[in-house]
Amino acid sequence: MKSLIIGDCHGEAPDIPEEGFDLILCAGDICGGTDEMRNKMFEAMDTEKEWYELFGEEEAKEAVKSSIQEGKEIFDELDSLGVPVFIVPGNWGWTGENSDWEFLEGRGYPEMLEEFDNLHDLNFDCIEEKGWNFIGYGPCSGPEIPQYEDDKPESEEEMDDIQRDYEDKKQRLQKLFTCEKTVFLSHNVPHDTSLDKIDNEDSPVHGRHYGSVIVREMIEEFSPEYSVAGHMHEGKGRETLGDTECLNTGLNSVW
């Protein structure tokens, strides 16, 4: 079985061959986004406002519509290839997770996949294809449990909520790892590897690791044959953890 692997397109269509593979794996962040949107999202982390309030709600709605449309155009190209496409959402999938913005309801992921016959949502699911089991885990922009003191919330209540969410996600995934010959498709890479290290010397978190704790724990507990992920654009490449070959697809890459 030959797989085509796509990572973090961010609205830019990748250079996809027309044949030579049996299925496609997509690690999320297919939809686009502007620098201004990203800046407001980072800015909102230090305020009590949502990013779209800082951006201007009507302008934000138009920006999200444009982002989703860019994603759908790429999905349409993938769908036209006539092979199964397994996808997990990234943090640019407009899932509405961790957001009360009613505008997103029914617009983003996974609803945006419904018009395509060959696209399959793998988030917290297991699908068997050609003798292999594909397990998916979607949005995750950093360690599910904060690993650095300045990332930890101020209140015990917030930390308790984080812990409960982490335990819930971990247990949901553990129930899926029941078979051999497994490919684990996640948005974020395993924590504390060469694949998740912040190498940008201008970054305030230079040298830190912001991969997924849960992805690492699933690899250590179940040893899937392959771990495929993206999100961390800097860490493009491969690393082996135990018996698992791990791949960081990098930015707008095809493997």
Regions found by a protein language model. Give the residues of each.
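Short, conserved loop/helix-junction motifs that constitute active-site signature segments
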Residues: 18, 76-82, 176-178, 219-222, ...
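Active-site-proximal segments of metal-dependent phosphoesterases and phosphodiesterases across multiple
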Residues: 44-64, 68, 180-223
